[in-house]
Amino acid sequence: GKDVRLAKIINLYGCEIGDETKIGAFVEIQKNAFVGRRCKVSSHTFICEGVTIEDNVFIGHGVTFTNDSYPRVTTDGQLQTEADWKVEKTLVKKGASIGSGATILSKVTIGENAIVGAGSVVTKDVPANTIVAGNPARVLRTLAAGSWQRAAGSKRGNS
């Protein structure tokens, strides 16, 4: 894309990066991954094949995406070949924010304007306009009537 800013030490392999996106140092983005316009991908982040990141998304430092529920082992214990590999897609919708050190498992959609807390492990879909955190990540707050509301049963954070 146009006006993309890339740090000096990065690994990009057949991916697509939208206009005005910033990619930090020591980031790897694999083939068939897409990062939208006006995104920021912070240092030490791994974006694997099959990940789509829409526009205006923030990715914190050291975020890891996965793309296979059973990586590199077949049912008989052998290493998979490229032909055995089954890429499971992940989608991060526009305006989402993922905190540093989060791990996003495969087959997950992170909704529009959702926020994933630092260090979270996202194992299932994150609804739009929610804040999730923890291992596994769970909903802490939702955006309703223009302000963040504590989710039922949530004990974290201020009121």
State where each predicted segment sits:
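Conserved switch/coupling elements of ABC/ABC-like ATPase nucleotide-binding domains
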Residues: V121, P136-V139
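Intrinsic disorder/low-complexity segments
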Residues: S154-S159
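Flexible, glycine/small-residue-enriched loop-and-beta-strand segment within the central core
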Residues: R5-V108, P136, L143-A144, W148-R150
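C-terminal/domain-terminus segments
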Residues: T109-D125, N129-I131
